[in-house]
Amino acid sequence: MQHQEQIDISLWTEHYDMDKITDALLEAECQTPLILGISHINISSDGTKISITYEDDVKTYQKKQKEVEQKVSEIISSLISEGMSELEKELVIHKYMCEHISYDGEALENAKMNQMKKADKVYRDSFTAYGALINGKAVCAGYAGAFKLLADKAGLENIIVTGSLEGGLSHEWNKVNIDGAWYVVDVTNNDTQFYPNALLNLSDQAAASVLVEDKRYVIDDNIEKYSADNIEQEYYFTMGKYYDMNQIAEKIVKELQTKDIVNVRTDYMMTDEQFETIMEEVEKEMGEEKLGAGYWLGVIRVERKDAK
């Protein structure tokens, strides 16, 4: 974190094999978002030293770190007040990020052009918490790093998780401990107007069709400690907008009487056929009203197309 270019690990190599040392090194890199951009890490052939190459010179690196730390303190001071529950803290942090950070699609496309191994200099900040918190734009790594720093400052136990999106594109998200239970939170994919907060406090099972974990983010032996098996604090459930499939059409119709756009949730494993059945019921009740609708991970969005 202090821009060290050489780290002596000889004391550890005497007691641990290289697999465990590599595992620990990967965890340290993943879970320390104040490390603002590493271009290369190498372990010496004799296993006694780690060499690190940074994207920025030491002066720039330290300046960016200071800016991030100051911004984190400023944000948390404005958001968190005494007596807030852990869930309340998480939700205000999450809301702040969705309102103040935009996804940097250009940075992602640039990384794709480089086989996802690097990005051109102009885009590199977007892969860090600096891009998210200072520049206001980032890709998933920046979102995940920013969430960790803010949640840490607010006193919430949390981690960054690495893996892929639907088994393809590399992706990063978070898990957070709320009242003793771990939950999946993906601010990047929640920052959308179509299916907002679809990945806010899900279980591993509910998120598994979209978020595929690898083992890079934490020491392998500890992965099970972060299992998310609970949905009590799932966003739509806590907001009173989660309904059984046999009730949801009625609820959508009721909300459409006073709203132009409705977002509600039902079973995460809802199929296309089940969604079509629900919408047939809604359209039958709405008569001639023209509707647009879609779903993702059980979140249904219905919009009145004729609304002015």
Task: Describe the role of every protein-language-model region.
Residues 181-278, 292:
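His-Asp-centered catalytic microenvironments across diverse enzyme cores
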Residues 1-77, 253-258, 263-268, 272-308:
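Linear, non-domain "peripheral" regions
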Residues 63, 135-138, 162-165:
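Alpha-helix capping and helix-loop boundary segments enriched in small/acidic/polar residues
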Residues 129-143:
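A short, highly charged nucleic-acid-interacting micro-segment common to nuclease
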Residues 68, 89, 139, 143, ...:
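Hydrophobic (often cysteine-bearing) scaffold residues that line and stabilize catalytic clefts
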Residues 57-132:
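Secondary-structure boundary elements
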Residues 141-207:
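Hydrophobic/aromatic-rich core segments of domains that either
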Residues 114-118, 127, 138, 149, ...:
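Extracytoplasmic/periplasmic C-terminal soluble domains
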